[in-house]
From Swiss-Prot:
SUPFAM superfamilies noted in UniProt: NAD(P)-binding Rossmann-fold domains (SSF51735)
Function, as annotated: Catalyzes the NADPH-dependent reduction of beta-ketoacyl-ACP substrates to beta-hydroxyacyl-ACP products, the first reductive step in the elongation cycle of fatty acid biosynthesis.
Binding positions for substrate per the UniProt entry: 135
Gene3D superfamilies given in the database record: NAD(P)-binding Rossmann-like Domain (3.40.50.720)
Gene giving rise to this polypeptide: fabG
Protein name listed in UniProt: 3-oxoacyl-[acyl-carrier-protein] reductase FabG
Organism: Rickettsia felis (strain ATCC VR-1525 / URRWXCal2)
GO molecular function: 3-oxoacyl-[acyl-carrier-protein] reductase (NADPH) activity; NAD binding; NADP binding
């Protein structure tokens, strides 16, 4: 049984479906959760569900100073889950430099800053769990998402490098790469589009946000103390690597 009692977890992008599921599960397992995002209303709604043992931190990940401050404001930090991310999809020949840059800045650079600042804090206690949320397309690629795929592939490479650097300090760094997870985005697909995607998934269905949360909870636990530098794929077999 996973027990996170006494641990403090910071989850970015907690106002979204996957981030909310992660926050709820880590909280259920006993962790104090710092839920962060840019949508205060949604964070407050999540807080109403959690009821206690949580803190809300509003943060704009496009602002480097806010990224650093988000970590420094936490009096204690045992678990960091970098879940926030954005998309700005179009074919490469139509993609503007600023569309590429803003996705890289939030999905990769902001997460690097969060990882770096969290490591500084975790090194003091010689303990930490960092979980970066990547994506299936960080491995497979996807047309119209050169910027997003680059950011998610970069996140996996960064995770591996950091895991080498901090392994002797009691800190593990891993990634979780979700496949097609049921969300507001997938709900907008028409029936034909949904069927085409499901046909590519051996388990024959979309994943749920809770499936991703379960992988995160395991990596955040002491049961995963001998796992670092790895990417856990939660995709129903859609991509086997």
């Amino acid at each position: 049984m996973i027990d996170l009692t006494g641990k403090t977890s910071l989850i970015t992008g907690a106002s979204g479906g996957i981030g909310g599921a992660i926050a709820r599960l880590l909280h259920k397992l006993g962790s104090h959760v710092i839920i962060s995002g840019s949508n205060e209303e949604k964070l407050k709604s999540l807080g109403n569900v959690l009821k206690d043992n949580y803190t809300i931190e509003i943060c704009n990940l496009a602002n480097k100073e806010e990224c650093s401050n988000l970590i420094s404001k936490a009096p204690k930090l045992d678990i960091l889950v970098c879940n926030a991310g954005i998309t700005s999809d179009t074919l490469a020949i139509r993609m503007k430099d600023e569309d590429f840059d803003k996705v890289i800045d939030i999905n990769l650079k902001a997460n690097f800053i969060l990882n770096r600042e969290a490591i500084k804090k975790m090194m003091q206690n010689r303990y930490g769990r960092i979980i970066n949320i990547s994506s299936i397309v960080g491995i497979s690629g996807n047309p119209g998402q050169a910027n997003y795929c680059a950011s998610k592939a970069g996140l996996i490479g960064m995770t591996k490098s950091l895991s080498y650097e901090v392994a002797t300090r009691g800190i593990t760094v891993n990634a979780v790469a979700p496949g097609f997870i049921k969300s507001d985005m997938t709900d907008k697909l028409n029936e034909k589009q949904r069927e085409a995607i499901v046909q590519k998934i051996p388990l024959g269905t979309y994943g749920m946000p809770e499936d991703v949360a379960n992988a995160v909870a395991f990596l955040a636990s002491d049961q995963a103390s001998y796992i670092t530098g790895q990417t856990i794929h939660v995709n129903g077999g859609m991509l086997m690597v």
